């Protein structure tokens, strides 16, 4: 199954991926990436930060953008080429994060698409935003 090709995409088209952050997500992400920053995994340490509690890794939310791109828009077969990120607010265990991608530019000649990317929490607060450059899948040659 392939995602949408360049000629099937429409400016303003959107897709979302939603996930609630769990303790296991943070511990597994720390283990996979090697990012054992105590702000993420040590509650006693985190109590003394300006967040006052542990926070999720910012890049964990960026992974949700990757899921929206790779599985929904444009979807399977998409090549993720570039991502700019701005971390706007902390994410905590129990927060429900919705990654949203929106087609903002289409370059049919180069088979490139620019996507506006955001992650919002359950309150609608944007916790991360940015822009992605992708190459959508091409139709298989017959």
Q: Where are these predicted regions, by residue range?
A:
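A broad, low-amplitude sensor of folded, mature protein cores
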Residues: 29, 42-44, 79-80, 84-86, ...
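HotDog/MaoC-like acyl-thioester-processing domains
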Residues: 1-11, 91-142
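Mid-chain, well-packed structural core segment of small domains
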Residues: 71-95, 99
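Hot-dog-fold acyl-thioester-processing enzymes
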Residues: 1-78, 141-142
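Short, charged/polar low-complexity linear motifs in solvent-exposed/disordered segments
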Residues: 34-35, 46-47, 79-81, 111, ...
């Amino acid at each position: 199954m392939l995602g949408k090709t360049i000629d099937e995409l429409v400016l303003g088209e959107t897709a979302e991926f939603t996930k609630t952050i769990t303790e296991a997500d943070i511990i597994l992400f720390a283990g996979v990436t090697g990012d054992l920053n105590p702000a993420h995994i040590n509650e006693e340490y985190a109590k003394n930060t300006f967040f006052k509690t542990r926070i999720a890794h910012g890049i964990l939310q960026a992974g949700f953008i990757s899921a929206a791109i790779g599985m929904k828009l444009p979807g399977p077969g998409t090549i993720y080429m570039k991502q700019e990120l701005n971390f706007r607010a902390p994410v905590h265990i129990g927060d429900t994060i919705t990654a949203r991608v929106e087609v903002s530019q289409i370059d049919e000649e180069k088979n490139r698409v620019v996507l506006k990317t955001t992650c919002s929490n359950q309150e609608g607060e944007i916790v991360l935003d940015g822009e992605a450059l992708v190459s959508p899948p091409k139709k298989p040659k017959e």
